[in-house]
């Protein structure tokens, strides 16, 4: 498989990049204000009286330290004007922390190492659009909070008629490192070569925002990511992008906790249930214009993922 690596410093800003950036900024300004600083400080007010018992073992007393790859709108991204993390996931975990009488500090993480960093106690928990799968469950436990599938983002009109990953043989495609989408593209590429076709020409980048920029700059013909991300960029750029084919591989995403940290797991589960029952969860879906089918219900059999 062909893999092309790029660094941020090697790329020059384009009109397309500025257009996407302006629209993202506009969307954030229209959304309700709030968020947590990506690098550390939390400008949120003092938490109210706890309604959920807080965990007993925190990295910093009084603070829930949260790892998140803040390059994945609409779930987690950074407001360029304030440097604060924002998005559905950020709002949710901040409200959950407040229900435990804690402040939330969001630490920008590398998605490719985020699980190992949690195990190494760099964070108390991780919320970062993590699909729950068997490989990750070997290292951490999950409290599901969201459901998402995978989809292709292509140029408006879908000029190459791309419907599934099997249509990508020999084509340039962008994807974020460490994701289930990368795994699926690797599998599809092997199927291409087994059928006597060219491998998929993958450009694998660390940040999802940079992956989308590849499509803006016409360096790839498609990108592959979680369906909410695809939907988000289509909404931000009317007439520029569309979904290629259907959403596939719908699966739960979870807030991850170190194995054996029963106090943290129970607190996160109880706090999420609180958000689900008091209307906060539903209000955040409305705020971020998410699809109701992506909700995880209190009665969902996937409420706990441990092994």
Which residues are covered by each model-predicted region?
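Acidic, polar ligand-binding/catalytic clefts
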Residues: 94, 103-167
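Extracytoplasmic small-molecule ligand-binding "clamshell" domains
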Residues: 47-129
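A ligand-binding cleft/hinge motif common to bilobed small-molecule-binding domains
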Residues: 112-113, 130-138, 185-188, 216-249
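C-terminal motif of bacterial Sec signal peptides marking the signal peptidase cleavage site
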Residues: 27-32
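Bacterial lipoprotein signal-peptidase II cleavage site
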Residues: 33-43
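Bilobed "Venus flytrap"/periplasmic-binding protein-like clamshell domains
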Residues: 68-73, 85-98, 130, 151-207, ...
């Amino acid at each position: 498989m062909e893999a092309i690596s790029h660094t941020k410093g090697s790329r020059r800003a384009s009109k397309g990049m500025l257009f996407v950036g302006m629209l993202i900024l506009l969307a954030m300004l229209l959304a309700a204000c709030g968020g947590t600083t990506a690098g550390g400080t939390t400008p949120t007010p003092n938490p109210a009286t706890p309604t959920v018992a807080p965990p007993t073992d925190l990295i910093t007393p009084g603070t829930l330290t949260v790892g998140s790859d803040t390059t994945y709108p609409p779930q987690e991204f950074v407001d360029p004007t304030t440097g604060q993390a924002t998005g559905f996931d950020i709002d949710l975990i901040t409200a959950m922390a407040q229900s435990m009488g804690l402040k939330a500090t969001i630490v920008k993480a590398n998605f490719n190492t985020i699980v190992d960093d949690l195990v190494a106690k760099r964070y108390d928990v991780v919320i970062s659009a993590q699909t729950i799968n068997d490989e990750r469950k070997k290292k951490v436990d999950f409290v599901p909070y969201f459901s998402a599938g995978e989809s292709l983002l292509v140029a408006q009109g879908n000029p190459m008629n791309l419907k599934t990953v099997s249509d990508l043989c020999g084509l340039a495609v962008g994807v974020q490192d460490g994701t289930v989408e990368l795994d699926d593209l690797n599998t599809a590429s092997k199927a291409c070569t087994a059928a006597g076709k060219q491998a998929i020409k993958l450009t694998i980048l660390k940040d999802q925002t940079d992956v989308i920029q590849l499509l803006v700059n016409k360096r790839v013909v498609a990108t592959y990511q979680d369906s909410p991300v695809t939907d988000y960029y289509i909404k931000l750029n009317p007439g520029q992008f569309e979904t290629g084919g259907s959403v596939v591989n719908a699966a739960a995403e979870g807030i991850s906790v170190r194995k054996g940290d029963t106090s943290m797991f129970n607190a996160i589960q109880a706090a999420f249930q609180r958000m689900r029952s008091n209307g906060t969860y539903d209000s955040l879906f409305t705020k971020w214009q998410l699809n109701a089918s992506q909700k995880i219900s209190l009665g969902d059999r996937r409420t706990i993922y441990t092994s």
